[in-house]
Amino acid sequence: MFTDVTSKAGINFKYTIGDFTYKNILESSGSGITVFDFNNDGLMDLYLMNGAYLQGISDPDGKVFKNAHNELYKNNGDGTFTEVSKKAGVGGHQWSEAAGAIDLDNDGYQDLYVLNYGPNIFYHNNGDGTFRDITGSLGLAGPEKLNGFTKWSIGVSFWDYNKDGRLDAMVGNFMAFDPSYKSPGTPDLMPSPAEYNGQASMLYEQLPNGKFIDVTQKNNLYFPNSKCMGLTVFDYDNDGDLDIFQANDHQLNFLFRNDDGVYKEVAVAAGVAANDQGIGTGSMHASIGDIDGDGLIDILVSDLDHGALYRNLGNGTFEDITKVSGLASEMEGKGCWGAQFLDYDNDGDLDIVTANGTAEELILQYPLLLENDGKGHFKNVGKEHGSYFSTKRSGRGLAVWDFNNDGFLDIIISHVDKLATAALLKNEGGNGNHWLGLTLKGKNGPASAIGAKVTVTAGGKKQVLINQWATSYLSNNDPRLHVGLGLQNQIDQLDINWSDGKKEVYRNIIADCYLTILQGKGLVAK
């Protein structure tokens, strides 16, 4: 059962869109969510993106929202949160879409990279509850314009693309938004994304001096008219290299296969470029996980039609099982934005939660909680699991986390409807199933931990997990790995394939706790 505890928790965030009227595609995109522990107290905190008034885009009446800002909620550990964005120095009055939390300099504290319509901002965590803007020294603001219009960034994935031990960053950019454009046939309606040009996503390489340079074209990743809505980095073909899935809006998706540092776009050949009708839809992002227990990582792509579920066949290709899995009938016409795999009942298989709402107009939809039967077939059980799932909303960003550290995954969803509030859904748990939470730390920082593959064996059952939390629309999930164990109260064996190629094995791990594993040193903290 999920209980809406938003008000009780003190989360008073309201998405403003910088306006009173909902009239353009920028305003329809919604608010991103980032889960991270900014003060290292073992409790996950929350960063919510907002849209401030934009001169020349927002209606003049929207000037009352010129001071709208992003909000940082510190977890108090008692089920409540305190908003501390101004004290921490991460409020800002820009139009923000998403943020990536990462310990860039390996000082033990999570930094924050905020992606905006306009210049991006990188906040360094000072370790005392405050942040400072170091964007200029890093070179991560991004270009002022792309394809002739203001740069519109929607997300970031960090990983060590060239295996030099330093974190690099790929920034997803969406489209060349012309605020003055009106559709010829329907000038009073919001234009479709298909009517605009795109903007190239950009790969930034970190140099030994800590600065970043644009290496997009050098790595065959430059597509100047693409319309990225989400980036997911993982090793889909099990060759030891991290690949890139780019979800594109009203275009074919991209899958950049990494062969020893050389990228090639293979989405069509791999079977993940389009939906089951061969059409590039309004893809939002990709969530990854093994939905049928075969040890291979599958891909869930949310879109405004019925989404796509691609089953990994283990030979570098995927099979579209959206219909046979039951997803097509459950998600048809819902307008899905955020969608995420999670084992909400800790029974040892991955379920799905979605945030829904029609794009062009504020047509509300029911959110979905889709139960996995263990074989990759899904059924909506939302209305049986809380009143939120019986209430139509217009959802956007969605993150899965465990805010109270009880081992049962909670959910937070942002909205662009008239309420425009976030919804914190507490998982009441109570079924007696066991679980394990895991934080991976690489030997020399996050570089060898991001994208690492973890195989958990308990009671003869194997589950494969990928250490990647940037897998939701505009949002970052709880950075800790979570695995449901059903009735098993210990893990017999835990295998880690680190992203730098190193391998480690651990045995006989007691369940129902959060652990930290430091590469080369083993279990270092609970």
Residue ranges of model-derived segments:
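Beta-propeller fold detector
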Residues: 3-7, 82-86, 132-138, 213-217, ...
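Hydrophobic beta-strand segments that make up the repeating blades of beta-propeller
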Residues: 43-50, 107, 111-116, 169-173, ...
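Short, conserved, GDST-rich strand-edge loop motifs in beta-rich repeat architectures
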Residues: 49-65, 174-196, 354-363
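Asp-box/WD-like beta-propeller blade repeats and closely related beta-sheet repeat scaffolds
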Residues: 84-104, 115-161, 176-194, 198-200, ...
